[in-house]
């Protein structure tokens, strides 16, 4: 049974009628452009074929009824005519409530809805299960009530819900790629203007995500520290964000900066350059250049931004030893654990899977990896 069929079946069981519509919103992986989003820079993610699915229908009352199929059909009911506050018990419900509340703040005109939510985006792996949920809820209400909201507005609404209602700091990339992703394309996103450019993926290339299963322990405190260091560097150069610093200027006077701050700035400034070049390399089908840029990105994250850990570095080395110049591999996400992403010919996937299974536990204290083979997928919409 597909995720769509499963969600529809639970809807019928819970509400005793057919849903009006079923919609989906995907998770994502970032191919290159790490810690550039909050520096007003560039990122190059793609949506993946792991997604949140919602079967839904309108209600005659002004209530939102939500069933979480993946949490033993836990239920949340709240009114559109009363202040929407965080749920006393269910963390998942806050993502739904936050999206609904922020749609109201945008003066969107909608009534009650019955929703059944299910998904297969791995949680805690840095593949944006939360952004997928936020965009899916927004898309469900938009589709039910024909709300005049663009994909960018749905993404911004999800980001606001996560930042202000749920209380998690995040950039706009995750929601934007979930809302706007295109089949068989990555999306070059300008995080300042929110302009996007669809970048075709080469044929017969797999997007492989490997979870190190190293828990991302320091990520919140270290994220905040890195962000402050980037802001310090931007102030030194008298610009709004590091995106505005010319690389030649930076290299000519980087010695005047605090050494650690200089390293952080060097990563962001060079990563923006790499990301723009990578979009062109990918569009041209130049996997050799793409692989070189992904390698440079990983080295920069390891040595300048200092956000990798030894098991992650080992995992990258194992994959690189198999794919050589036929693709690329690097850590993806906030750092200190989590996942790596690799682009490779479909023909090498099983060879990589075998090499990682055989070699990785020796470098990871006996941990085993989780292996996902993905394709670049369509963003939110009817399914």
From Swiss-Prot:
Q: Which residues bind ATP?
A: 124-130
Site note Transition state stabilizer applies to 28
What are the record's GO terms for cellular component? Answer: cytosol
Instruction: Tell me the residue numbers annotated for binding substrate.
Output: 34-37, 223
Which cellular compartments is it found in? Answer: Cytoplasm
Task: Offer one example of a GO biological process linked to this entry.
Answer: galactose metabolic process
Q: Name one Pfam family in it.
A: GHMP_kinases_N
Q: Name one GO molecular function term.
A: magnesium ion binding
Keywords from the named record:
ATP-binding, Carbohydrate metabolism, Cytoplasm, Galactose metabolism, Kinase, Magnesium, Metal-binding, Nucleotide-binding, Transferase
Taxonomically, which superkingdom?
Answer: Bacteria
* Catalytic reaction list: alpha-D-galactose + ATP = alpha-D-galactose 1-phosphate + ADP + H(+)
Q: Which pathway does this chain act in?
A: Carbohydrate metabolism; galactose metabolism
Q: Where does Mg(2+) bind?
A: 130, 162
InterPro entries per the record? Answer: Galactokinase, Galactokinase_bac, Galactokinase_CS, GalKase_N, GHMP_kinase_C_dom, GHMP_kinase_C_sf, GHMP_kinase_N_dom, GHMP_knse_ATP-bd_CS
The UniProt record lists the EC number as 2.7.1.6
Q: Which family does it belong to?
A: Belongs to the GHMP kinase family. GalK subfamily.
NCBIfam families xref list: gal_kin, PRK05101.1
What name does this protein carry?
Galactokinase
Q: Which organism is it from?
A: Yersinia enterocolitica serotype O:8 / biotype 1B (strain NCTC 13174 / 8081)
Gene name of this polypeptide: galK
């Amino acid at each position: 049974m597909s995720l769509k069929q499963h969600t529809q079946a639970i809807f019928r069981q819970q509400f005793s009628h057919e849903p009006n519509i079923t919609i989906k919103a995907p998770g994502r992986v970032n191919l290159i452009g790490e810690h550039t989003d909050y520096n007003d820079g560039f990122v190059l993610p793609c949506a993946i074929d792991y997604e949140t699915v919602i079967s839904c229908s309108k209600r005659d009352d002004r209530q939102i009824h939500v069933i979480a199929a993946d949490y033993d059909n836990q239920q949340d009911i709240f009114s559109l005519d009363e202040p929407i506050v965080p749920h006393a018990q269910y963390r998942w419900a806050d993502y739904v409530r936050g999206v609904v509340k922020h749609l109201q703040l945008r003066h969107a005109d909608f009534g009650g809805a019955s929703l059944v939510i299910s998904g297969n985006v791995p949680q805690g792996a840095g593949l944006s299960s939360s952004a997928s949920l936020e965009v899916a809820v927004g898309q469900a209400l938009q589709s039910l009530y024909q709300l005049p909201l663009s994909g960018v507005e749905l993404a911004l609404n999800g980001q606001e819900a996560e930042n202000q209602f749920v209380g998690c700091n995040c950039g706009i990339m995750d929601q934007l790629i979930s809302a706007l992703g295109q089949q068989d394309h990555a999306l070059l996103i300008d995080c300042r203007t929110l302009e996007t450019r669809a970048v075709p993926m080469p044929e017969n290339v797999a997007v492989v995500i490997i979870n190190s299963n190293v828990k991302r322990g320091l990520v919140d405190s270290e994220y905040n520290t890195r962000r402050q260091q980037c802001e310090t560097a931007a102030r030194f150069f008298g610009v709004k964000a590091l995106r505005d610093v010319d690389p030649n200027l930076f290299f000519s006077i980087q010695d005047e900066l605090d050494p650690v701050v200089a390293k952080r700035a060097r990563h962001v400034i060079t990563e923006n350059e790499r990301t723009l070049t990578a979009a062109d390399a990918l569009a041209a089908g130049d996997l050799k250049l793409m692989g070189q840029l992904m390698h440079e990105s990983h080295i920069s994250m390891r040595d300048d931004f200092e956000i990798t850990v030894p098991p992650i570095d080992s995992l990258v080395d194992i994959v690189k030893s198999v794919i050589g110049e036929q693709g690329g591999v690097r850590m993806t996400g906030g750092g200190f654990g989590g996942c790596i992403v690799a682009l490779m010919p479909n023909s090498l996937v099983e060879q990589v899977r075998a090499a990682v299974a055989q070699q990785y536990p020796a470098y990871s204290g006996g941990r085993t990896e989780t292996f996902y083979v993905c394709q670049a997928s369509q963003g939110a919409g009817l399914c």
